[in-house]
Amino acid sequence: ANVKLMVGFTLRFVPHYVQAREIIQSGKLGKIVSVYSRRMNVITQADRLGGRIGVLHFLGIHDFDLLHWLLGVEPDQVYSAESTSVEKRHPQENETFNTFKFKDGTLVCAHIGWNLTTAHPGGRDFKLTVIGDKGSLDIDLASQGLLMYSEFGSKFPSTAPGLDVEDKAFIDCVLDDKPVPATGEDGITALKMVLAAIDSIDKDAPVKII
């Protein structure tokens, strides 16, 4: 069918992450050594979904795609583990650390969970740290936003919220017959990462992403 398919990977359109990708790909951070991402929601988010889906399918898939998109390199393997110190309110995974090795050797740790209490002032905690051999970059969506430290100096780029950017991008692709920025293949890669992470939790062992 002659239709446009665009996967709703919203993080690709958040200005902070768009700037982060531009900085990474410009080489200002040098060769990327490691990346840490954190995406946390309050526990009531899990209650709202009532066990119909786990945190990796709900939140993790967005961060996994973000990491793949930022680095522009294919993931190779993952070792994932979930916390079992507190009895879960739902059967699916709800607090995980996922360590990926990408095919260029970059090490990535993604902390994905929804165990923040309702006392948390923001109800969510989203962070990203990128370490390169010539500089580093930090994103904290609860505070300053995006910070960069490198031989080019320290910068605090101006950012603004923009979820509408995603909708506009898709409309433009349809009207102007342009390639979509998040393809079905991108969706398949992110889903493979999620399924491998869940498999790793079940096996308590590293799993290749095929």
Go through each PLM region and give its residues.
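Predominantly a Rossmann-like dinucleotide-binding segment in NAD(P)-dependent oxidoreductases
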Residues: V3-M6, L11-H90, D204
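Active-site loop of classical SDR/Rossmann-like NAD(P)-dependent oxidoreductases
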Residues: F156-K168
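A generic structural signal for residues located within well-ordered alpha-helices
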Residues: P15, L59-H62, V165-E166, E185, ...
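A short, polar/proline- and glycine-enriched secondary-structure boundary/capping micro-motif
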Residues: A119-R124, M148-G153, P157
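Short, mixed charged/polar active-site loops
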Residues: L107, S136, G153-K155, P206
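C-terminal helix-rich "cap/oligomerization" subdomain common to oxidoreductases
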Residues: K103, D172-I210
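Short, hydrophobic secondary-structure boundary micro-motifs
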Residues: I32, V78-Y79, D140, P181-T183, ...
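Contiguous beta-strand/loop segments that form the cofactor/metal-binding neighborhood of enzyme cores
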Residues: F64-Q144, K168-V180
